[in-house]
Regions:
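N-terminal beta-propeller domains
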Residues: 1-98, 261, 265-304, 331-333, ...
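Beta-sheet repeat architectures centered on beta-propellers
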Residues: 2-98, 239-241, 523-526, 569, ...
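Predominantly extracellular/luminal cell-surface or secreted proteins
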Residues: 89-91, 175-181, 226, 326, ...
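Beta-strand-rich solenoidal segments
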Residues: 90-101, 219, 224-298, 395-409, ...
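Autoprocessing Asn-cyclization modules and mimics
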Residues: 95-112, 121-141, 154-156, 229-232, ...
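Extracellular and organelle-lumenal recognition/adhesion modules and their flexible linkers in secreted
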Residues: 97-229, 342-346, 353-355, 367-372, ...
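Short beta-strand segments and strand-loop junctions that repeat across beta-rich extracellular domains
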Residues: 107-111, 265-270, 368-381, 410, ...
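Beta-sandwich interaction modules
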Residues: 193-201, 236-246, 347-349, 385-428
Length: 742
């Protein structure tokens, strides 16, 4: 029998046609079979979907992925990633560079370093290296330095300039200032391996300084003034990678994971200065230590050299990998070229002859230098050993006779006058764990290395560890910041950094603050599609969702208090999950259904539930991107592979789960991506951006189009309900420019 049902609320949204006959379900009477471009409110009313305002085009109209950057309410940006390029939008405008005639002399170093002044400190060396690099090799204390004064024409003074610096093997220290060695324009900063676009405004001519104190070769590829136009920073992610980019942000740094790609960092160094650099921890994480007979032999204790394997082991894809080699016995060496230069320490323990070590000094005679032996009981506070001071070459043995005490020793240059004095301490007991990174591949038994932590011997050792990440072993696919640690997951493993040390994975750190490394080890876990820092750290695997937890509620995760448990077997699609308060929302592995992860009040564990139960086909033919808008209400934008959007109006407390559809069919409108920036002070709505592919005048274009605010769509003098609109506000005019996008 027909009925007249009063529509008292429009916040039930779409219901599946499979459920239309369910008259026994109260919400069916208030639901719709079709609800397109209508936006319900939790309150019960609804409105026409606001228009989409034209912001600008993607680079070369290519497909892109937008990443929100939010430092504060007032400091926000949208990062546009296209194939191997990043551009930055601030307040809906791209960062651009001004046209200036200023130029760096010989900024790419094709054959030499002409134009750059050598100001190396004693013992350090800055040289040209094959491949067209500036090579900086410090001593650990003395710096290799190159300077250049750059002339600025009068008309370019007080105009913003930008340096584009490409670092092949970092880090390198940069300073830019009005005088040599000063940093009034760009404060002294460390530049990692990658690309840097650094803005500054000189009042006149300025000096660039590139330097390194590290006792390993640092390679800089180029240093040039950026050309006029949009700022573009090179990235490692090609077009096929964009859907797999997984970011998480801490202050000015966005950490980025991507399937089969090394981790990177996007760094904001100032509002208009950005970098994209490799994430390169120097102390781990490492795989399980070698248990076989294969040995590795470093050719040097420090600096740059080679690593030799006793069997055919290395692959070209090992380049970039870390290796740790633990020696039998300890040997430390230092070429002293400045006062207070010192060797690393050796540890002396045991009794009797086990405590004897050798002191070897060369290049000392006739220099006027003085070298002393120092002792420490904590490897931090040093005192001179009485009677152990040298001004000429010497080789001698020393035994302190402090049986059963743990003592550290080192050699120090207390007086420096000239030359290079080589100081070596050697003891046959104890061990040193050195760490290197592979820089080049020669063959299966030989690779080039840079030493990050000095080795203890140049003899073969079967006590070695391989780094967990490399092109050979694979890279993590997801990242999250949780509990004061930086977490990476993928390749069946989850790794958490040292507490409050996001770039340290040093397993020698003792106690609860040490790093965490665990195998997930259940089901297909090669790719972790997302990590969400909810009340618990959640991982989205291909066949299950995992919860990282301690033994007791609210205890922090530590190396000895860490467990991984399956909490759902729905499995996750290759779409980044999103966090809504303490709840997670993700796409089920089929790619079309949307689930939430909620804390169960009884078990205090996270469980999954379907948000699309009453309209299971809402995600068809597949969801490719998601983002959450919190103001004026919580709305989850789910971009579908057919170019439309499934929009979830959501309020957990009010039990509102309302699905509607959004489309923009004009000019073949096809939504490909979504990004949300939060509202700021005085703003009532978040900023929602769609990337829309359209056909304009027969050409394919891709526009960023921004949702209008609801207040601008209420029928006032300005009503912004059109799509790809451009609004003009000003004096009466017969000609309006800037309409090329139409």
């Amino acid at each position: 029998m027909s009925q007249n049902i009063p529509f008292i609320a429009f916040n039930r949204g779409i219901i599946s046609e499979l459920a239309l006959a369910r008259a026994d379900i109260k919400r069916v009477a208030l639901s719709a079979e079709i609800m397109t471009n209508w936006i319900p409110r939790t309150l019960g009313s609804m409105t026409l979907r606001p228009g989409l305002g034209y912001i600008g085009s993607t680079k070369d109209n290519l497909a892109s992925k937008s990443i929100p950057f939010v430092f504060s309410q007032t400091q926000k940006a949208r990062l546009e990633l296209t194939a191997n390029i990043m551009r930055v939008w601030i307040s809906d405008a791209l960062i651009t560079r001004a046209a200036v005639s200023t130029a760096v002399t010989n900024g790419t170093w094709p054959v030499n370093l002409t134009g750059w002044t050598d100001n190396d400190e004693a013992g350090a060396a800055s040289t040209w290296a094959a491949g067209g690099y500036m090579q900086l090799l410090g001593t650990g204390t003395a710096a290799a330095i190159r300077d250049q004064q750059v002339t600025v024409a009068a008309g370019d003074a007080n105009v913003e300039h930008a340096l584009n610096i490409v670092v092949n093997r970092g880090p390198v220290t940069l300073m830019v200032g009005p005088t040599v060695g000063s940093d009034g324009y760009i404060a002294e900063t460390s530049l990692g391996t990658g690309v840097h676009s650094l803005a500054f405004t000189p009042a006149g001519s300025f000096w660039i300084r590139l330097q390194s104190r590290l006792d390993r070769a640092i390679l800089v590829d180029s240093c040039t003034i950026e050309a006029a136009g949009t700022m573009e920073v090179t990235t490692p992610w090609d077009a096929s990678d964009l859907a797999n980019v997984r970011p998480d942000q801490s202050a000015d740094v966005i950490y980025v994971a991507c399937v089969d790609t090394q981790q990177y960092k996007i760094e904001r160094r100032a509002t208009r200065s950005w970098s994209v650099v490799k994430f390169e921890p120097e102390d781990g994480p490492f795989r399980t230590a070698n248990a076989g007979t294969m040995t590795l032999t470093p050719s040097v204790l420090s600096g740059n050299g080679s690593l030799t394997s006793s069997v055919n082991f290395f692959r070209s894809t090992h380049v970039g990998a870390l290796f740790a080699v633990t020696s039998t016995g300890q040997s430390v060496l230092k070429d002293m070229t400045i006062v207070l230069d010192a060797t690393n320490s050796i540890l002396v323990e045991g009794t009797s002859t086990d405590r004897a070590f050798t002191i070897d000094l060369s290049g000392l005679s006739g220099t006027g230098n003085t070298v002393i032996l120092q002792r420490s009981f904590d490897d931090a506070t040093w005192v001179a050993v009485s009677g152990k001071s040298w001004t000429v070459d010497a080789v001698e043995s020393y035994n302190d006779a402090l049986d059963n005490q743990i003592v550290y020793y080192r050699l120090l240059c207390s007086v420096y006058a000239a030359g290079t004095t080589t100081a070596i301490l050697t003891i046959t007991t104890g061990s040193v764990r050195g760490i290197c990174r592979i820089t080049g591949y020669t063959g299966g038994t030989l690779v080039g290395i840079e030493v990050l932590k000095a080795f203890g011997a140049i003899s073969a050792s079967d006590d070695w560890e391989e780094g967990r990440w490399s092109d050979y072993r694979g890279w993590p696919s997801s990242v999250a910041l949780y509990g004061g640690r930086l977490w990476w997951a993928g390749k069946d493993n989850v790794n958490g950094s040292v507490s409050d040390g996001y770039e340290s994975y040093d397993h020698t750190v003792i106690g609860d603050s040490g790093p965490i490394s665990r195998t997930i080890g259940s089901g297909p876990v090669d790719t972790i599609n997302w990590m969400m820092p909810l009340d618990r750290l959640m991982l989205g695997g291909q066949m299950a969702e995992f919860q990282c937890m301690s033994n007791a509620l609210d205890e922090p995760l530590t190396p000895t208090n860490f467990n991984i448990k399956q909490r759902s077997t729905q499995g996750s699609a290759a779409v980044n999950g999103i966090k809504v308060d303490n709840q997670g929302i993700f796409t089920q592995r089929g790619g079309a259904r949307v689930f939430s992860m909620d804390m169960d009040a009884g078990s205090l564990n996270y469980v999954s539930s379907q948000l699309s139960a009453l309209v299971p086909e809402i995600g068809d033919p597949g969801i490719v991107a998601m983002a959450v808008q919190r103001q004026p209400e919580t709305r989850v934008h789910c971009v579908r592979s057919d170019g439309t959007v499934a929009l979830l109006v959501f309020d957990k407390l009010e039990e509102v789960i309302c699905w509607v559809e959004v489309e923009t069919p004009g000019a073949g409108g096809f939504v490909e991506d979504v990004c949300v920036l939060p509202s700021g002070s005085g703003e009532k709505e978040d900023h929602v951006y769609y990337q829309v592919r359209r056909t304009i005048n027969g050409a394919t274009v891709r526009y960023f189009e921004k949702w209008a605010t609801e207040v601008a769509c209420r029928g006032d003098a300005t009503t912004l309900l059109a799509d790809s609109y451009i609004a003009y506000s000003g004096v009466a005019a017969t000609v309006i420019t800037g309409l090329g996008s139409l």
